[in-house]
Amino acid sequence: MIDNQKYVILSLELHLFFSRIMKEHALFLEAGFTNKNYNLAMEADHYKKQFEDLLSYTVSASNGIIRPDILYSEELVTTLTSVAEQKTEEFTGIEINKNITTRELNLQSGVNPQVGQDLVNYVAQLNSDAIRLLDGLINFKERVLDGVLSCTIFTSNYPLLLEHIIHEANLYRSYVVDLENKIDIESKNAKEIELFWDHIMMEHALFMRGLLDPSEGELINTSNDFAIKFNELIEKTNEMTDSNIKNITEETLNETVEFKDFKEAGASGIEQCKIKSIILPLLADHVLREANHYIRILESYKNM
């Protein structure tokens, strides 16, 4: 059981990371529909706005509360996020609340913050809102995936990407439910966490490989190499025991840092129009933040 202080801190940190991820999932869905599916695009836009609101309310309560390592990991926003949002808005015509990013860049961390009952109640409402919104968004994503697999909907998003964003939403929801039950989400089974994020990293590499222009041979090959490497790490992690867990975690951390560097160079290259692809700048920044998130988790295991 976690106390009120940890409940508040973990909840706010969770929403700062994942509600931004969810609003961007909705934007990627919206951008991927054709004119025929205007109603689906508008439904995606609805969820984008709802998760923007959730993120905004979370930012309002987070200053001086969240931990330094979360703030400095660049899993919430990166140095590229603001420009990525601006360019993605220009490319798609989809409105993005960029003020939230500015506010997040100005957040300050806290150490042993005072948490009163009013803040506990505020966070409980955020968690309740998050579960309600996630139930709707997961259902929407599943309907889109079903339509794509039955060939009744066309989208520029891969079916695997749709499955990928459903898995992330389900993970987010499970964490919110755990927090409402006062379960410490940081004490989750390390093997399960590593397997989840290894799959996510592998799929990122596959998406990047498939969204780069065919002329970008070197980048395509590097993306493919990362996909192979994370697939190997999945196999190793599946067989992980107490005797080799530290070695495998260390190997995974090193590989994820390398992949993060590749993603960062790619995001910068896409923003500067130096890489030929059909990757939205915000998608490049999105996958970079997820790598940063995983790196922080792996580093926390090293220190245990």
From Swiss-Prot:
One of its GO terms (biological process) is sporulation resulting in formation of a cellular spore. Keywords: Sporulation. It comes from the Bacteria. It is found in: Spore coat; Spore, Perispore. InterPro entries: CotB-like (IPR021328). Disruption phenotype: Inactivation of the gene produces changes in the ultrastructure of the spore. In thin-exosporium spores, the absence of the gene leads to a thinner coat layer. Inactivation of the gene has no significant effect on the presence of a polar appendage. Disruption of the gene does not affect the integrity of the spore. Its main location: other. Contributes to the formation of thick-exosporium spores. This is Spore coat protein CotB. It comes from Clostridioides difficile (strain 630) (Peptoclostridium difficile). The lineage of its organism: Bacteria, Bacillati, Bacillota, Clostridia, Peptostreptococcales.
